[in-house]
């Protein structure tokens, strides 16, 4: 969740306090989309998600905008009904995309995808290095969602907070 405080310029007094979860989710997804635009392969076709919440939904929208070549979206969640909800909400927006519910099977969602997105609060590895093909783009949004080997096999690590990342690779 997020709260935005809008202040007037001259004295800095608050003039509005707003619920900001939607805008915050859109901002995070925009960052992932911009990264995918510049770092993913030229014509990615498959995007895989672990997580089916609001961050994942916003990320699919951002990824599809910058990478319209995406043809398939695979999604895995802890609960199959969350996968179904994700697909029900997003498939009308992208009729040219095939949606695959992985039925809680993270490997089925991620293995061999061109773009991989983990959007959970998990504190245990969910993404395994063997599922990440060379040249793929991985957007890590939440907690500790991947094996250490995922970062160790990466060609590049691009982040917004190097201190957060460096403790993982030592």
Language-model region placement:
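Short acidic low-complexity segments
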Residues: 97-113, 129
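NAD(P)-binding Rossmann-fold cofactor-contacting core
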Residues: 66-94
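Conserved acidic residues
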Residues: 45, 114, 155
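N-terminal ligand-binding/catalytic initiation module
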Residues: 1-25, 33, 40-43
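Short internal alpha-helix immediately C-terminal to a glycine-rich phosphate-binding loop
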Residues: 27-48, 54-66
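Residues in the short beta-alpha loop(s) of Rossmann-like NAD(P)-binding domains
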Residues: 53, 78-79, 144
């Amino acid at each position: 969740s997020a709260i935005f405080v809008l202040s007037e310029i001259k004295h800095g007094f608050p003039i509005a306090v707003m619920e900001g979860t939607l805008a915050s989710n859109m901002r995070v997804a925009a960052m992932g989309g911009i990264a995918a635009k510049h770092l993913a392969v030229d014509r990615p076709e498959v995007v895989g998600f672990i997580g089916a919440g609001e961050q994942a939904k916003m990320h699919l929208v951002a990824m599809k905008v910058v990478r319209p070549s995406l043809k398939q979206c695979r999604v895995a969640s802890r609960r199959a009904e969350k996968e179904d909800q994700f697909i029900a909400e997003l498939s009308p927006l992208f009729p040219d995309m095939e949606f695959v519910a992985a039925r809680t099977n993270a490997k089925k969602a991620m293995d061999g995808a061109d773009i991989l997105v983990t959007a959970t609060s998990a504190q245990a590895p969910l993404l395994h290095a063997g599922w990440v093909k060379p040249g793929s783009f991985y957007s890590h949004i939440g907690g500790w969602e991947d094996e250490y080997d995922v970062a160790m096999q990466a060609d590049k690590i691009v982040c917004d907070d190097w201190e957060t990342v460096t403790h993982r690779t030592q």
